[in-house]
Amino acid sequence: MALKIVDKFRKKSDKDQYLVALDIGTEYVKALIGRVVDNQVEIIGVGRQHQRLTDMQSGAVTDIAGVVDNCDAALRQAEEMAGVVGKDTVMGIAGELVKGTATTIKYKRTDAQSRIEMPELRNILDRVQDRAFERARETLAWETGQQEIDVKMVNTAIVDVQIDGYRVTNPIGFQGRDVTIQLFNAFAPMVHIGALQQVANNLDLNTINIAAEPFAVAKSVGGEDTADFSAIFID
């Protein structure tokens, strides 16, 4: 009966926009189906499935086939509740091998009278990300004992920008000499990311984003207009 309900609404999901959120935890897989309404997501389906001890370790997938079965069970629960099938998914990534780092760079502009444009800002951000990438790679290499470990950035966000000591939310168009930018980046090993992508492929889902879960939680609570917001999250 559940499959008939899903099939009945399958065509509807082609007209409306739905998103699937998958949180593949060490103990449980959690699945959400949401309807996109005015740039917000209305949750219409929820499901979860217990994982075996051999499926995950420290937040990382160790048995792709086992995790696929668990995700499928959680998705069926969410689909039955929602009455629709989503195809686009956002997957959470966590665990001890996901590294988040805040990097600060300070530099003096040669022409303080010129206005900051996008190419200049992009060059600064690239330098910050390169520095953060090497730091994350060195940390993961030390922790895993693998010197040639492939790492990929999963999230990035500007935390703070100051020009001549003056805090701004968008540096484009400003003049000044001393620029300080703090950038948060989250990195994860490619083997970890590749396992999640394979899980999504086996479930016939289109992965639109893989997000670092601690970053996603802070982003959803903090918002865009709360530069002075700070909090401690306890799981």
Regions inferred by a protein language model and the residue ranges of each:
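Active-site cofactor/substrate anionic-group-binding motifs, chiefly glycine-
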Residues: D235
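Nucleotide/phosphate-binding catalytic cleft detector across ATP-hydrolyzing
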Residues: M1-Y28, L32-T89, I93-I232
